């Protein structure tokens, strides 16, 4: 497991492959102060990770798809003060609560993921990718909103433009009730429920309150990650 600042950039697929094959183990060190502060050891972490395969987790929250569009900059426009680019490559990734679900599944847990999407091609991409990640995705369709998509246009390792396709309004009462039913259906087998809230309307306070009432009755452990992006 390697942690980094996330600021490494590569100019080609060959460089990416070479860099990951030739990782210098001498540059990797353990955060000993953190481990000591939290009384963590390698043996304890291994035991915890092995127990993940025994867990049934329900994750509910905002699904986000991140798309990175690599462009070739042609120069400045003669008509207006804007940059002209040609898209060269595009890559999509599961993000938001979807990546939380994918990480939990990759550690061996059985994962149900509940969210809301639009009726569009991005939804289809999400369903296919989450299935490959061994996530049982239960994505309700809301035709009043798009599936949240964040596009980043980049050139020479710099972001030129960000475009967000989203709707931040709260989901309807009807969709909230459908989510509650999905949670009730699997709650007897669930060990952990995770709220993953990115403030895009999937978790209005009324829904959270109703879910908490259900989890209290079943003495279910609940974790929450609330943020804006």
Language-model features, listed with the residues they occupy:
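Conserved C-terminal "lid"/linker of ANL adenylate-forming enzymes
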Residues: 1-5
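N-terminal beta-alpha lobe that positions the nucleotide/phosphoryl donor
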Residues: 9-11
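Ribokinase/PfkB-type carbohydrate-kinase core domain
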Residues: 16-74, 79-80, 87-229
């Amino acid at each position: 497991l390697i942690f980094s600042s996330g600021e490494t950039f590569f100019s080609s697929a060959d460089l990416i492959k070479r860099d990951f094959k030739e990782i210098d183990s001498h540059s990797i060190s353990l955060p000993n102060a953190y481990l000591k502060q939290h009384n963590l050891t390698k043996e304890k972490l291994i035991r915890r990770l092995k127990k993940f395969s025994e867990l049934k987790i329900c994750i509910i929250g905002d699904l986000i798809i991140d798309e990175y569009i690599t462009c070739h900059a042609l120069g400045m426009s003669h008509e207006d003060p804007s940059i002209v680019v040609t898209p060269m490559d595009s890559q999509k990734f599961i993000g938001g609560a979807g990546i939380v679900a994918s990480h939990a599944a990759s550690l061996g847990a059985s994962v149900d993921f509940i969210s809301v999407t639009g009726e569009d091609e991005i939804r289809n991409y999400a369903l296919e990718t989450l299935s490959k990640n061994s996530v049982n995705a239960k994505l309700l369709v809301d035709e009043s909103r798009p599936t949240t998509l964040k596009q980043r246009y980049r050139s020479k390792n710099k972001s030129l433009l960000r475009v967000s396709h989203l709707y931040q309004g709260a989901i309807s009462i009807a969709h909230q009730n459908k989510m509650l039913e999905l949670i009730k259906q699997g709650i007897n087998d669930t060990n952990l429920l995770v709220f993953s809230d990115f403030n895009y309307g999937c978790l209005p306070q009324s829904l959270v309150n109703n879910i908490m009432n259900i989890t209290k009755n079943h003495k279910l452990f609940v974790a929450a990650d609330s943020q804006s992006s």
